[in-house]
Regions:
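Active-site microenvironment for binding and transforming phosphate-containing groups
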Residues: 1-253
Length: 253
């Protein structure tokens, strides 16, 4: 588990960016696979989620995960939230309720954890390229502001994800972003006639543009096997038929 230096300063919250070590799964899911949507044994995944919850002192019954759909849809979880077996469809969660853990799972996409140190509100965002393109980050931050947040009180941490050097994209991908945002050109690099995209840096840029200055980026490339993270792109390259998911969690104590 990786802890953010910035978020670790606050005793009111618990959080963690988890790698693939320390779980119960085997084979291509070895070992802390937290992807309920993967083809791994459900029993193993549920045991892995219990391990994660224990690490951040949370009841596994109080962990909320989404059926992530690469959207800009988010949910505000209030004290009346009823825990159901069926997960909500979306890609970000927000709450001000104590002891409710918000989690997102990734396998190269960018996990973002946000804390309002004044209002004691937390958010967990799954920021894949589609969600970023659909402005999920902007929508979450604007919602927080609507709830009374001031951007000077927001702490945002970008967790481990695929880095630019490993994220090759096609021309139509680049064109799509350039058409929407001319500034995105600074996040594309050409090397040996191949185009690469710095998704995590682009997320950082978006958060900064929205007025958040208290930012941290955890520079761990999920694609690089030595960093011990699950990676969708690496699994596809290795011709594996599925892949595990890394989880990132935040909770108000």
């Amino acid at each position: 588990m990786i802890k953010s230096k910035k978020l670790s300063k606050f005793q009111q919250i618990n959080h963690g960016f988890f790698d693939k070590k320390g779980g119960k799964s085997t084979g291509i899911y070895k070992s802390l696979n937290c992807g309920v949507g993967s083809s791994d044994s459900k029993k193993n995944v549920l045991n892995n989620l219990k391990i994660v919850c224990k690490k951040i002192n949370c009841s596994s019954k109080n962990l909320i995960l989404l059926n992530q759909i690469h959207s800009s849809k988010f949910y505000f979880i209030n004290k009346n939230y009823k825990f159901k077996k069926k997960k909500l469809n979306g890609d970000a969660l927000i709450t001000n309720v104590k002891k409710i853990a918000l989690g997102v799972v990734v396998a190269d996409c960018v996990p973002v954890l946000i804390y309002d140190k004044n209002l004691k509100i937390i958010s967990a965002i799954h920021a894949g390229w589609k969600g970023v393109y659909k402005e999920i980050i902007k929508k979450v931050v604007k919602f927080l502001i609507k709830k009374g947040s001031n951007t000077k009180n927001l702490v945002a941490v970008i967790g481990p994800s695929i880095s630019e050097k490993s994220y090759e994209v096609q021309k139509d991908f680049k064109d799509k972003f350039l058409k929407k945002d001319k500034q995105s050109k600074f996040f594309f690099k050409i090397r040996k006639n191949k185009t690469y995209f710095g998704l995590n840096k682009y997320v950082y840029y978006h958060l900064k543009k929205l007025g958040i200055k208290n930012l941290e980026i955890i520079k761990k490339n999920t694609f690089d096997p030595k960093n011990n993270f699950f990676s969708a792109r690496r699994s596809i390259q290795n011709k594996e038929n599925d892949y595990g998911r890394n989880i990132s969690v935040i909770m108000i104590n």
